[in-house]
């Protein structure tokens, strides 16, 4: 499934990791992750090794894990209130949930992922990173955890176009909370295409397109949607996460 931020989340059974030198953006890492910068470096290494070996991260992504993945995801913290509960829907290899947890120790985060091999990686990663008191992992699709879990913020990256994502994510958001989705240049087009879905669901607030992180072109574009305080209505139901055919970068292999 083509996704707005253009980020490949998986690749078929990679066997070679590029040996290109990796430039660490030391100042940005220190600023964003603070005294957890060493844990962020450990997570980056997990993605570059086990993440690639298990097909969760494409080998060509390794040289840009810091900028395009860890920092890119951690910047979401700029639009999330202090002490919020967060569900990271379709977490994959932990993006954006794990970088967000590392950058924001005040958040309580639940990673929701339907596929077993990704779920296993996530459990191993949060243990390795010492995040078990802050981050939990649930295996399932959005409709599997609906009614069991909810949060003040639901995050998503490279999961689905907004037209589909609204129906999966907004029912997991508590009244007054937000959906925060990482999107790229397609954000405005996706918002326009999904307008009728929001109307069907009874959401009246207009989605916001926000830029977080540096203003030098390396920041992150996000779409933030307020859940509101009224009841949600069912929109035309899309197929659940995991049932939709994913693009080659996000296969459904176990």
Curated annotation (Swiss-Prot):
Keywords assigned: Cytoplasm, Methyltransferase, rRNA processing, S-adenosyl-L-methionine, Transferase
Signal sequence residues: none
Annotated gene: rsmG
Basic residues bias: start-end ranges: 244-254
Low complexity compositional bias, start-end: 9-21
Organism: Kineococcus radiotolerans (strain ATCC BAA-149 / DSM 14245 / SRS30216)
SUPFAM superfamilies according to UniProt: S-adenosyl-L-methionine-dependent methyltransferases (SSF53335)
Region (Disordered): 1-21, 230-254
Name of the protein described by the UniProt record: Ribosomal RNA small subunit methyltransferase G
GO CC terms of this entry: cytosol
Principal location: cytoplasm
Cited Pfam families: GidB
Similarity comment text for this entry: Belongs to the methyltransferase superfamily. RNA methyltransferase RsmG family.
Function text: Specifically methylates the N7 position of guanine in position 518 of 16S rRNA.
Subcellular location: Cytoplasm
Positions with a binding annotation for S-adenosyl-L-methionine: 90, 95, 142-143, 157
Enzyme Commission number(s): 2.1.1.-
GO molecular function ontology, one term from the record: rRNA (guanine-N7-)-methyltransferase activity
């Amino acid at each position: 499934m083509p996704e707005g931020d253009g980020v490949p989340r998986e690749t078929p059974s990679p066997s070679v990791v590029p040996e290109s030198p990796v430039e660490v953006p030391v100042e940005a890492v220190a600023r964003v992750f603070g005294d957890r910068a060493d844990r962020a470096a450990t997570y980056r290494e997990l993605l570059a090794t086990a993440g690639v070996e298990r097909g969760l991260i494409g080998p060509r992504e390794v040289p840009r894990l810091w900028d395009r993945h860890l920092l890119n995801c951690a910047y979401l913290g700029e639009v999330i209130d202090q002490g919020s509960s967060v569900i990271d829907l379709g977490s994959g290899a932990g993006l954006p949930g794990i970088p967000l947890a590392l950058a924001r120790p005040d958040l309580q985060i639940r990673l929701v992922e339907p596929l077993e091999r990704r779920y296993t990686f996530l459990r191993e990663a949060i243990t390795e990173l010492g995040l078990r008191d802050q981050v939990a992992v649930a295996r399932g699709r959005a409709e599997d955890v609906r009614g069991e879990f909810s949060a003040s913020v639901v995050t998503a990256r490279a999961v689905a176009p907004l037209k589909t994502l609204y129906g999966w994510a907004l029912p997991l958001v508590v009244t007054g909370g937000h959906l925060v989705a990482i999107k790229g240049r397609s954000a405005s087009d996706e918002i326009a295409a999904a307008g009728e879905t929001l109307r069907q669901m009874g959401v009246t607030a207009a989605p916001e397109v926000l830029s977080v992180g540096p203003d030098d072109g390396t920041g992150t574009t996000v779409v933030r949607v307020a859940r509101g305080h009224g009841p949600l209505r069912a929109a035309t139901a899309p197929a659940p996460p995991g049932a939709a055919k994913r693009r080659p970068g996000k296969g459904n292999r176990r």
